[in-house]
A protein has these predicted regions:
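FIC/Doc superfamily catalytic core
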Residues: 1-14, 18-30, 35-38, 44-300
């Protein structure tokens, strides 16, 4: 019968941090390690995992995004993801800007109108520019542990300067003051949002590394809480981007023409996880095609 030691005991034995020990366990690098009552138990005879080859552990996408962002390189993956993620995420929420208009705003910081009779909503333009800034923030802080303050910061970036921000009861960068619904379903009440969000983040951060399915599951729980008055979908998808980059997982884009499958998956997660996971995996295939085109190595 196996004898087990605690994470702390393994950390002392291997001369590494407790976080590193938990990370080894999460990644399956400690054979026969057991997760019980929120804690990892390590076989007493387990040996310290060897260090991964730097090439295997390298986050090529995040590295490229940061390089292209820093030097404002156009026509690369940073350029591509900024436009496609922003266009599709905003369009899901009702933005009327076209893909070309979104691209034009990103490239020139001006709005191109196809004719003198064309009009656009000011909020659509502001939220598009703000979404570009929010993606930049995600890239900069991708490796940080997810926190309430960061989530609130994303909301503040997204909604600053919009007509919503001028409403006395609309809390930009803070949790909602009025009850709301999503898809006709009730969400967490304003009085309970603080506690629910703290629990959601605390539970999620029990692990250092997360799988694709765990990131999607977090998204479902976040959207059901619906912590902000508006902008929850976009903030939620920005969190997905951050966590995929942090965990060296190819991110995904929910295309506007797949939004009904996306909504169906969110609504029916408890009954059938496969619907949402398949939609997200389809969106991941879209991004993988981008990475193949730009010659960026990723873990399949």
């Amino acid at each position: 019968m196996n004898k087990f030691i605690t994470v702390k005991e393994a950390a002392n034995k291997w001369n590494v941090s407790e976080r590193s020990v938990r990370n080894y366990c999460v990644l399956g690098r400690v054979p026969d390690a057991v997760f019980e009552n929120g804690c990892w138990l390590i076989p007493e005879t387990a040996k310290k995992p060897t260090r991964l080859n730097e090439k295997e552990n390298k986050n090529h996408l995040l590295e490229r995004l940061r390089e292209e962002k820093k030097h404002q390189i156009s026509g690369g993956i940073y350029h591509k993801l900024q436009i496609d993620l922003t266009y599709n995420s905003n369009h899901i929420e009702g933005s009327e800007l076209t893909h070309d208009q979104t691209r034009y705003i990103f490239e020139t910081r001006t709005i191109g109108l196809e004719s003198t009779n064309t009009s656009v909503k000011v909020d659509d333009v502001i939220e598009t520019i703000n979404h570009f800034s929010a993606i930049d923030r995600v890239i900069d802080f991708a490796n940080y542990e997810l926190s309430e303050s960061f989530i609130k910061e994303l909301h503040k970036i997204l909604k600053t300067g919009t007509s919503d921000s001028r409403l006395s009861w609309f809390a930009v960068g803070e949790y909602k003051k009025r009850s709301n619904e999503v898809g006709g379903l009730a969400t967490t009440s304003p009085q309970q949002v603080n506690d629910e969000m703290k629990k959601l983040i605390s539970d999620y951060n029990q692990k250092d590394k997360h799988s694709f399915e765990e990131i999607v599951e977090f998204h479902v729980k976040f959207e059901r809480i619906h912590p902000f008055q508006d902008g929850n979908g976009r903030v939620g998808r920005l969190i997905i981007l951050k966590e995929c980059l942090k965990n060296n997982i190819v991110p995904f884009v929910i295309l506007d023409n797949k939004k009904m499958f996306y909504y169906r998956g969110l609504k029916n997660w408890n009954q059938e996880r496969g619907w949402l996971l398949d939609t997200c995996l389809d969106g991941q295939d879209t991004v993988k095609a981008y990475l193949d085109y730009f010659g960026i190595v990723y873990h399949s």
